[in-house]
Amino acid sequence: MLIVKKFGGSSVADKDRIFNVANRVIEDYKAGNDVVVVLSAMGKTTDGLIAQAKDINPKASKRELDMLLTCGEQMSVAYMAMALESLGVPAISLNAWQVAMHTTSVYSASRLKKIDTERIQTELEHRKIVVITGFQGINKYDDYTTLGRGGSDTTAVALAAALHADACEIYTDVEGVYTADPRVV
C-alpha cells in the first residue's frame, strides 16, 4: 500500500514534534507500506522569512520571494529525513526541482501542471521513506514558484493522484473533527 502523509508547520515546529511525526510515519513503514511524506515549513518560518524580506526590500519581486520562501520547506524535509535515519529507517528528502513538480509561471500563486514521479518511484523501490517539500514547484524557466497558502495540502493531493496512492492523509492540529469549513458553518 502507498500512503501520502502531509504534516503542516505546527506539526514539525521543533525537534520533539519532528520526532513525533517521524515515529508516526515509521509505524506505517514498518507495517510494510510505502510512505511519501509532504511537509510545510516549520512553525512560523514562512512568516519570518516574509518579514525579513520586507525589512530588506518592501517591494521585493514575487520571484525573489518565491526563491526565499522555498527554503522553509527544504529545511523541514531535511530535518525529517535526518530524524528518520537517526531512528534506523532509510529516508531521503527531495525538493520540487528534484521531483520535477512543474507549475505555471505565476509567482506566489502557481498551479501544479505535472509531476514527474520517476525519482519518487525509484526511491520507494529502494524501500526509502520519501520526504518531499510541499508548497512549491518549478516553472518552465526552472525558477522556484510557490502555490500560495495551503499549497502543501495541494502538493500532497497532487502527489497522491500522480502516484496512484492508496491513501492521502492530511494531518492538522485543530481541536476535534470538522466535517465542514468552520469559517462557513
What is each PLM-predicted segment?
Residues 1-185:
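Nucleotide/pyrophosphate-binding catalytic subdomain
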